């Protein structure tokens, strides 16, 4: 009723205001038509006062309406007061004027009243609906409007507490159950809860208020007492319902989120998810391979600007893609034909590359992880199995496949990054027979102009060391494979081991030898000559037996024996004198067609010495590597054969072991003097000789015989491979004899020269020839007796092809290491390195100087002693003992001890050996030198000062650090073998 009254009063006020406006207009007209009189003036004043009063009331009523919208109760009270006051003044005044006004405004006012009535009624209905909604909720469940004494909304508080805190949730559910039981119990009007904490009392107070009960505490103030009241009621929703709702919403939200993630993945599938899926599906080996390719491409781009590398990765990647389809079809077959050492990590059907465990010791100082070379075969198309680690090398291997016109000649060639003058070469597809082979340049993809043709297809890499803490020469893995038509075969490659101090080095892990049996119609299997040598520190005291990675060879010849006939039963007879066989580390493989020979040398560590040599041959005669010369300074064979000679050596730092470097050298035609290609070990006397006659291949053109010579080493030595370069095709001769001989002295300088000045007169060979009266019959050709040449000294007068080069870092000369592979600049004959090896010494050093090979006599050796034995940019430390040289003149022993603090920090023990001859400057002394630990004031020049390091690696690092700095003394490799037991016993006294 109040709302309807208010509406009627408002309409009356509006009508009165309109009447006043009409009266004003009438009065104005009268005032204009008539002259004003006093009565009229008085009426006008009265009308003006009435109008002002009406406007004032109307404005007040307007404010009241605005306030009524916000608060209906206030609107009801004030609107009634305004209506009562405004009704009286409008009655005053003559009735005639009021009637006239009503006549004039009757029509428009009715329309306006209808409109205003509708608007006001709609607004009031909305207000009523707003008021009725909470009132209905209160009638159903008034608990949601309950607040406690502090004004907290109980419903919101309880719901949040139930959802958030699990402990409080249990407490609230318990209290709810107890209160419900109390409400349903008509016998009790109050309930006393046990004493509880203040927080739980607070929860109980709020739950009791939520149920509409009185809640107080007892006299102690720790127990809550609740009483039933008239407002006590049970809420419509139980506490557990809020928890279920929350769980359902959370579950739905999680489900929606998962669905959204899946949809996002589907949406982005076209852009980025293919990369992610590829990443997920790739194995670790494939990821490492991809990483190595990208890393090689990046570093090749950077170093190519500095003149070190020329990256032709387009050809390499193309070959990798084409070879992947061919390789995958025969991997399983090749794997079954591959005899290899057993390892506990191997599985019977595994064709994947095996990754070695990463030990903690191998993660420091650039020590490489050792990988079994025979387990690198990969089942993936383009993978060659490699190890990924920081500071690793540029030349990661790629798989290169070629197919000849008749049959497929397959080789797994590590395609490593080349130096500036050499580019990567792929194995060309060769014609069926050597006689029909066109010139070499027609089969090469790319070759530098200044490279000589015999080694144009040699894939070798060179890399310079960078600025690092202790950098040394980088290690390269250059494979050199000879592969020929009409044979289906795999050429082995070995695992490349980076030097420990190299900042980044080549780590080429190429597949091992995997040979496919020759076709049915062929009588001769492909020949392969493998020289395998091992560092004693590689796998210390390994009981793992060695098995060659090729076809079984016929026999193991003893000293001075001839090869048996081909009809002999194949078998393996390794000769290992008094030592344990070590797991193989590197191999040198030269595969040649139509014949097969295996020459393997296995080396294991016993006291850091090379103790034995395994020589294994096949019954078939070997096939020589012919090279010819068509021009004066460019060596070019009449028919070319690509060769891969992978090799690697590594010495673990904690083991006193010496590596066996390999050097590959070539003799020009004018300087051969009847010599033939040879492979030799530079070792002390007492070597054994193994002979293997060779006969030319029946299907090949006239050739020069080849010969391999070396020793059965008893200490660390150097492997020297030598090739003769004949002027042209030679008439067939009797097979040459492979003989292991000893090289007494081997010295070599390094100096850049022009290609025309490659071979100096000093490199003329000084070789002795001997006659062989035991010819060997070829399977298809009768023998013809002829002399067989052999070298008494392998390294006499050789013009070497350098396979190892050391690069100094910008800060100073870098230090070499006892890990050798076929390295360096094999395609340039102007750089060559080979260290001198003195009799009985356990370590050697390298001297850089003029290009060429010098066979020095006693006087030459004395002249070069100081220069060649001081640690230079290419020195190699193989032992733990270094001599201290270049001390200041006149320094006493006590003063010198103060200079050796840096050595002591490296763990070295200084030994003062009395020089028997009294030579100043740290003379060599002898093995019988006595260690004196007494501190005297005598001169240090009277002693030979020896620093004994805990490991060869520590000695290597110390020599790097001290020789490259402004130290007052230098370290060099010991000239002789010091008895470590005597030195250690002297240091312990």
Swiss-Prot record:
SMART domains: R3H (SM00393). It comes from the Eukaryota. GO terms for molecular function: nucleic acid binding. Residues 320-331, 416-428, 705-727, 772-790 have a biased composition (Low complexity). Residues 36-56, 109-143, 277-288 have a biased composition (Basic and acidic residues). The modification Phosphothreonine is found at residues 869, 873. It holds the Pfam family SUZ. Residues 58-71 have a biased composition (Basic residues). Residues 695-704 have a biased composition (Pro residues). Keywords: Nucleus, Phosphoprotein. It is found in: Nucleus. Residues 233-303 form the SUZ domain. Residues 169-232 form the R3H domain. The modification Phosphoserine is found at residues 37, 143, 344, 347, 363, 866, 868. GO terms for cellular component: nucleus. Its main location: nucleus. InterPro entries: R3H_dom (IPR001374), R3H_dom_sf (IPR036867), R3H_domain_containing (IPR051937), SUZ (IPR024771). Residues 23-71, 106-147, 267-288, 306-390, 416-479, 493-524, 674-738, 751-793, 848-867 are annotated as: Disordered. Disulfide bonds: none annotated. Residues 454-466, 493-517, 761-771 have a biased composition (Polar residues). This is R3H domain-containing protein 2. It comes from Bos taurus.
């Amino acid at each position: 009723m109040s709302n309807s009254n208010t509406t009627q009063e408002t309409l009356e006020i509006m009508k009165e205001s309109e009447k006043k406006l009409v009266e004003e207009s009438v009065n104005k007209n009268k005032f204009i038509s008539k002259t004003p009189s006093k009565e009229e003036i008085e009426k006008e004043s009265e009308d003006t006062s009435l109008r002002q009063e009406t406007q004032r009331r109307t404005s007040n009523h307007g404010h009241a309406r605005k306030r009524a919208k916000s608060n209906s109760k206030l609107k009801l009270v004030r609107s009634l007061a305004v209506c009562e006051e405004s009704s009286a003044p409008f009655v005053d005044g003559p009735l005639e004027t009021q009637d006239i006004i009503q006549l004039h405004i009757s029509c428009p006012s009715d329309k306006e009243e209808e409109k205003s009535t509708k608007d006001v009624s709609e607004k009031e209905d909305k207000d009523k609906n707003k008021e009725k909604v909470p009132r209905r909720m209160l009638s159903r469940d008034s608990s949601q409007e309950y607040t406690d004494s502090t004004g907290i909304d109980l419903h919101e508080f309880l719901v949040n507490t139930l959802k958030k805190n699990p402990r409080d949730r249990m407490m609230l559910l318990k209290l709810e159950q107890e209160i419900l039981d109390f409400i349903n119990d008509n016998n009790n009007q109050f309930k006393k809860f046990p004493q509880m904490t203040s927080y739980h009392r607070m929860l109980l107070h709020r739950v009791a208020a939520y149920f509409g009960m009185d809640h107080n505490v007892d006299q102690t103030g720790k127990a809550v007492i609740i009483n039933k009241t008239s407002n006590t009621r049970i809420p419509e929703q139980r506490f557990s319902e809020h928890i279920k709702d929350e769980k359902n919403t959370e579950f739905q939200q999680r489900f929606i989120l998962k669905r959204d993630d899946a949809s996002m993945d589907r949406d982005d599938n076209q852009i980025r998810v293919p990369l992610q899926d590829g990443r997920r599906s790739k194995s670790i080996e494939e990821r490492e391979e991809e990483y190595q390719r990208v890393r090689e491409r990046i570093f090749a781009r950077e170093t190519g600007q500095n003149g070190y590398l020329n990256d032709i990765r387009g050809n390499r990647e193309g070959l990798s893609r084409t070879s992947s389809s061919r390789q995958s079809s025969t991997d399983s077959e090749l794997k079954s034909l591959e005899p290899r050492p057993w390892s506990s990590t191997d599985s019977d059907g595994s064709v994947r590359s095996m990754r070695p465990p990463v030990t903690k010791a191998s993660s420091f100082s650039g020590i490489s992880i050792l990988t079994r070379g025979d387990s690198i075969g990969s089942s993936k198309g383009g993978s060659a199995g490699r190890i990924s680690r920081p500071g690793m090398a540029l030349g990661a291997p790629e798989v290169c496949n070629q197919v000849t016109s008749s049959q497929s000649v397959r080789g797994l060639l590590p395609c490593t990054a080349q130096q500036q003058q050499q580019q990567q070469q792929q194995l060309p597809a060769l014609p069926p027979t050597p006689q029909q082979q066109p010139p070499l340049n027609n089969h090469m993809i790319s070759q530098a102009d200044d490279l000589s043709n015999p080694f144009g297809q040699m894939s070798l890499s060179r890399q310079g060391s960078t600025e690092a803490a202790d950098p040394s020469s980088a290690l390269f893995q250059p494979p050199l494979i000879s592969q020929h038509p009409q044979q289906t075969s795999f050429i082995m490659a070995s695992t490349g081991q980076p030097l420990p101090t190299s900042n980044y080095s080549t780590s080429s892990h190429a597949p091992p030898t995997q040979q496919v049996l020759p076709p049915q119609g062929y009588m001769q299997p492909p020949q392969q000559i493998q020289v395998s040598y091992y560092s004693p520190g590689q796998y210390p005291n390994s009981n793992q037996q060695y098995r060659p990675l090729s076809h079984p060879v016929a026999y193991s010849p003893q000293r001075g024996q001839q090869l048996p006939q081909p009809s002999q039963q194949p078998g393996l007879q390794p000769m290992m004198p008094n030592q344990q066989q070590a797991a193989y580390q590197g191999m040198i493989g030269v595969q040649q067609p139509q014949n097969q020979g295996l020459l393997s040398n296995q080396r294991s560590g016993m006291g850091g010495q090379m103790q034995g040599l395994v020589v294994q041959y096949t019954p078939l005669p070997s096939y020589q590597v012919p090279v010819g010369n068509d021009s004066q300074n460019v060596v070019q064979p009449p028919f070319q054969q690509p060769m891969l000679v992978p090799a690697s050596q590594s010495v673990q730092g904690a083991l006193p072991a010496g590596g066996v470097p390999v050097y590959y050298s070539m003799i020009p035609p004018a300087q051969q003097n009847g010599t033939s290609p040879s492979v030799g070990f530079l070792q002390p006397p007492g070597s054994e000789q193994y002979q293997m006659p060779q006969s030319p291949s029946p299907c090949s053109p006239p050739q020069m015989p080849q010969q391999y010579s070396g020793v059965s080493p008893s200490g660390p030595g150097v492997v020297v491979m030598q090739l003769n370069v004949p002027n042209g095709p030679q008439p067939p001769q009797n097979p040459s004899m492979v003989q292991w001989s000893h090289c007494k002295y081997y010295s070599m300088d390094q100096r850049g020269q022009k290609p025309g000045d490659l071979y100096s007169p000093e490199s003329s060979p000084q070789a002795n020839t001997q006659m062989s009266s035991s010819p060997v019959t070829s399977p298809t050709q009768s023998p013809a007796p002829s002399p067989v040449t052999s070298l008494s000294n392998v390294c006499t007068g050789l013009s070497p092809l350098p396979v190892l080069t050391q690069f100094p870092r910008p800060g100073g000369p870098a230090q070499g290491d006892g890990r050798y592979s076929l390295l360096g600049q094999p395609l340039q004959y102007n750089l060559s390195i080979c260290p001198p090896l003195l009799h009985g010494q356990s370590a050697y050093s390298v001297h850089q100087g003029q290009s060429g090979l010098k066979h020095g006599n006693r006087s030459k050796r004395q002249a070069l002693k100081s220069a060649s034995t001081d640690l230079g940019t290419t020195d190699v430390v193989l032992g733990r003992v270094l001599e201290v040289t270049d001390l200041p003149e006149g320094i006493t022993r006590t003063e010198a001890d103060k200079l050796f603090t840096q050595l002591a920090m490296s763990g070295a023990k200084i030994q003062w050996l009395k020089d028997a001859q009294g030579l100043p400057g740290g003379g060599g002394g002898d093995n019988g030198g006595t260690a004196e630990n007494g501190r005297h004031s005598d001169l240090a020049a009277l002693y030979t000062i020896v620093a004994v390091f805990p490991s060869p690696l520590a000695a290597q690092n110390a020599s790097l650090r001290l020789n490259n700095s402004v130290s007052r003394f230098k370290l060099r490799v010991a000239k002789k073998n010091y008895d470590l037991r005597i030195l250690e016993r002297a240091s312990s006294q």
